[in-house]
């Protein structure tokens, strides 16, 4: 068995195994643990009562967190004409069509979100092997293929998070950064879970939100007592 580091030992001493934590208690405890050498994110994992092997039970969507994620988001938009002007006015970092595609093919992929208007998909379609592996391919299911690119840019800049159930039926996403006030972090998590419940697959049976776990980038995961959340 690998020997625990000094930091891991200090963390283990503060964690109570098997406990379901009140949300505020969990957030405060995670923030008090020995810090990494960078500002860590708060991450959430939500175990859903779905069978991800069934296409009609794959949960995929996006949520605009009321207090954002604390991250600076770089956005590229594939569109043209008045929509291009609207995207720039909304805060897009780069707007283009074939010229932008050429830049991305050349390796310029310093973006967190890529958005496209429907008429631009003929260009974006050529970038599947470039954008797909990085999770950047625009998709109408998460609002990144839309005629209203300006709103999509505003949402991305405001802290919209995108998620999809993994092979175990769990969604993972960041919900803030260390330094967030516990009440704002809680409201972000509640907004996410409310959206997950809103898009519950009709074929999902039994308990839908089975477990909620809060962690930091380099820290442990703490199971949250769901009765401490207003959802």
Curated annotation (Swiss-Prot):
Q: Which domain of life is it from?
A: Bacteria
Q: Which UniProt keywords apply?
A: Repressor, Ribonucleoprotein, Ribosomal protein, RNA-binding, rRNA-binding, Translation regulation, tRNA-binding
Q: Note the InterPro entries from the entry.
A: Ribosom_uL1_bac-type, Ribosomal_uL1, Ribosomal_uL1-like, Ribosomal_uL1/biogenesis, Ribosomal_uL1_3-a/b-sand, Ribosomal_uL1_CS
Q: Name one GO cellular component term.
A: cytosolic large ribosomal subunit
Q: Please name one Pfam family that this protein belongs to.
A: Ribosomal_L1
User: Which GO molecular function terms does the record list?
Assistant: rRNA binding; structural constituent of ribosome; tRNA binding
Q: Name one GO biological process term.
A: regulation of translation
PANTHER family xrefs: 54S RIBOSOMAL PROTEIN L1, MITOCHONDRIAL (PTHR36427), LARGE RIBOSOMAL SUBUNIT PROTEIN UL1M (PTHR36427:SF3)
Stated family: Belongs to the universal ribosomal protein uL1 family.
State how it assembles.
Answer: Part of the 50S ribosomal subunit.
Q: What does this protein do?
A: Binds directly to 23S rRNA. The L1 stalk is quite mobile in the ribosome, and is involved in E site tRNA release. Protein L1 is also a translational repressor protein, it controls the translation of the L11 operon by binding to its mRNA.
Protein name, entry field: Large ribosomal subunit protein uL1
Q: Which organism is it from?
A: Pseudomonas putida (strain ATCC 47054 / DSM 6125 / CFBP 8728 / NCIMB 11950 / KT2440)
> Which gene name does the record give?
rplA
